[in-house]
Design a protein with these regions (language model features):
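N-terminal accessory scaffold of Fe(II)-dependent oxygenases
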Residues: 1-239, 249-302
Length: 302
């Protein structure tokens, strides 16, 4: 059996403890309380506000965490108003992996339905001010990046470093590790989530399939016996810190709103840069990179 360990808790009101924690790598996950009291989002981010102010934001309810699965295209407010409806009953239309409309209902399971996918920070830049400043700015270099440079980095790594996940009760994020040894953080604004994490040395895949902490299949994953699983229920206003290369899984115990951020600091900056240059090296032509630079930094040069 896996060995369950309660994730450590810290308070942001203990700066020496926080400093020591981040200086350690961080080497283990941690749930931090009292970290976002100064954010306007701590009071303003809820389903009622998002449904009211951003009702017409168009996106899609993804059929899986990974890209390339399509889902149900609809408005954010419509999704929130229909949390408890089967996916096919939510007003909207089906889209394929390329986000083109589908004529027929795709094969899917309600158990695999993930999160509402849209671009909140691009559509509503004021949201950034509502989650600023980061509680521990010395340990998060990303918050100091100009928006155009951040946009370029995200284009190169093909991943957003900051996202808002709105999902229904029971939505699962399968075990995965984040990119380029970034540090991850999850802040819960609505509902609660069960989180399970495995360190890099305590996780073993099986033919590329992720281990499911909710269905302990030791026949397929014999290596997972006696491995350490760090667990906790992440509650409203709490921040989970995910160390680099740690595998993590979440299960929404309620309808949920979560802020996800990935960042680097002096401990993992070199690792991120190596990953960045690896991504650049995989580009088919130099013109591809030049186009990204022109798109995101061109205005800054004039």
């Amino acid at each position: 059996m896996t060995i369950e360990i309660d994730i450590r808790r810290l308070s942001a009101r203990e700066p020496d403890e926080i400093q020591a924690y981040f200086e350690s790598g961080p080497s283990e996950p941690c749930v931090i309380s009292d970290a976002i009291e100064h954010w306007p989002a701590a009071r303003a981010w809820n389903f009622d506000r998002f449904a009211r102010d951003f009702f017409d934001d168009f996106g899609f309810i993804s059929l899986a965490m990974e890209d390339g699965h399509g889902g149900r295209a609809t408005k954010l407010g419509t999704f929130i108003a229909n949390f408890d409806q089967p996916l096919h009953a939510i007003p909207g239309f089906w889209v394929g992996p390329d986000l083109a409309p589908l004529r027929e209902t795709p094969d899917y399971s309600e158990d695999d339905v993930w999160s509402f996918v849209w671009r909140p920070f691009k559509m509503h830049p004021q949201l950034l001010a509502e989650i600023s400043p980061f509680p521990f700015p010395d340990h998060n270099y990303v918050t100091a990046l100009p928006p155009d440079l951040l946009g370029l980095l995200q284009a190169i790594v093909r991943t957003k470093l900051r996202s808002i996940y709105i999902s229904r009760k029971g939505s699962i994020t399968p075990l995965h590790a984040d990119f380029h040894r970034t540090i991850g953080s999850l802040v819960q604004f609505e509902g609660s989530k069960q989180v399970v994490l495995f360190g890099p040395e305590d996780y073993a895949e099986c033919d590329g399939d992720p281990f499911d902490p909710a269905r302990l299949d030791y026949t397929r994953f014999p290596e997972m016996r006696e491995r350490k699983a760090f667990t906790r229920i992440l509650k409203r206003s709490e921040m989970l810190i995910i160390p680099p290369d740690w595998w993590h899984y979440t299960n929404a115990l309620d309808h949920s709103m979560t802020l996800s951020q990935n960042f680097f600091n002096r401990n993992n900056f070199a690792d991120f840069v190596r990953g960045l240059f690896s991504d650049i090296g995989k580009m088919e032509t130099q013109e591809q990179l030049a186009g990204m630079i022109a798109k995101h930094l061109g205005k800054a040069r004039h």
